[in-house]
């Protein structure tokens, strides 16, 4: 592992200006708000939206003893690399790290190892991709990434808004009278809440105001009689 850490690249202040941070898709309703939170702090940030087509990509580098979420997450990163959408020098991978004993909690380290093995097999450019650990424990520090109070408050707002939109959307969508109306409202609410995050208005008072706004707008979606 010592050799591995010498290969894995540090995410520098210069990288913050030139690289896009890519996070695997885990929380559909929260992703759009996370993107707003990171961008508000000056990061170029995206969540991967490519659906996993071939999970066996991950099994080239890890055994099938790993849990299914681990396989899917690694496969999504690997499929993105194979797509050639961006040059390896333009991207950074980010992975939440729980730091526990569960294998899923150590996907961060596993992703580093996979990139290292790919570099060993001749794809040396992949060794230059920084991998950022998203955690609150101060592990795996990078000189160009820091969880600031602004990023933390934006992340909290993102989590709260994501859960709220999920509940409202799933309660209304199956019973909408006009097909597509709930999706339109969801997009409208997400746009307003993202703007609030981008303006660093993440305090409790503002969040509660936004909760009421979202509930009010969704409540006006026409639903089928009796629902």
Where are these regions (language model features)?
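An N-terminal assembly and electron-transfer interface module characteristic of large anaerobic redox
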Residues: 1-227
